[in-house]
Amino acid sequence: MALGSAALSVYTYAGTATSTMNVSVSVAHSCSIDSNPMAFGTYDGNASNAIEAIATIVSTCTSGAAALITMSAGASPGSGLAEAPVRRMTAGAGEYLVYQVYSDAARSTVWGNTAPTGVALTGTGVSQTLTAYGSVPP
């Protein structure tokens, strides 16, 4: 909440009277979020190593706003739980390529769709950048 005041003046022929008017506003907590695509490049079905990629997520929240950034299982989900969804890309006709998104560079913590598996942050009033780490297994 921001507070302030403004001075009021009244002029009359006989003299001047002044008073103070208090001014206030409540700032609602809010956030905006944006990201760039995670592009894995070319997949080789005979490769023995995973394909890795990253994407950035930029969140701007008002100062003090608590935010939880979660990720769904995507447009072509496989079986799995919200905590660790099986994510799949599709080329159509029932053909899928499994991938996963992680919240850490070691690619050991799945970025899920629940509070324990999402990424929490507190707004600072300026943009905060998070990195999402992706992997397509061999």
What are the functions of these language-model segments?
Residues 2, 11-12:
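Cleavable N-terminal signal peptides
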Residues 7-9:
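N-terminal signal peptide c-region/cleavage motif recognized by signal peptidases
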Residues 13-91, 117-138:
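N-terminal small/polar-rich segments of proteins
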Residues 72-74, 100-104:
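Predominantly extracellular/luminal cell-surface or secreted proteins
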Residues 93, 105-107:
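Solvent-exposed strand-loop boundary residues in beta-sheet-rich modules
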Residues 94-96, 100:
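Amphipathic alpha-helical hairpins/coiled-coils and adjacent low-complexity
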